[in-house]
């Protein structure tokens, strides 16, 4: 896809959080590995890479299916809880940082009267904790979290719920920005007018180019230049 857009063609921009606007991605693999280890399951680096971009509960389910075939819902929830507890402890001692240019891009979009949505696979409790750490509690017009939709990425639910909350009914006037294949696949499923991949997170340029997209840029700080 290669349809160039101006900010004048858009009503809203939907941003992923980890790896796209915030640098917290390095904590997630560690917490996931430790959460599984508590139940005696050791994950490889390749297994952890394979679930990047998926909702955290869906990632847990997929990994358990590979290891034990048919996990119970109780085990899935137990390991997911382990993961979240580990992650919360890491948030207390590790720094969460803004991706360079993210704040400036948000200011630019607001000056153009565009709506901003943040999407994340995290549950709302943890998403709010992360945003508070970086002073972003009120940065977006809406925040849609993994526990507020039926399906996580690569399903389009997070984007569609963002549109619903902000009363944006035409997907062609929506841009979606993310750092994973799941982000771009979700954008395609939602039929957004502009699907943007960024190279500050989980997946490489070559990996992102395997998915439907309109644009791949180094980072969110480059978005205003493209939309001007």
Regions found by a protein language model. Give the residues of each.
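Asp-based, Mg2+/Mn2+-dependent phosphohydrolase catalytic module
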Residues: 1-10, 107, 123-124, 129-228
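N-terminal helical cap/lid subdomain that shapes the substrate entry/recognition surface
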Residues: 3-103, 108, 112
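Conserved G/P- and acidic residue-centered "switch" motifs that form tight phosphate/ATP-binding loops
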Residues: 16, 20, 120, 179
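Short phosphate-binding/catalytic loops that engage adenosine nucleotides
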Residues: 112-114, 213
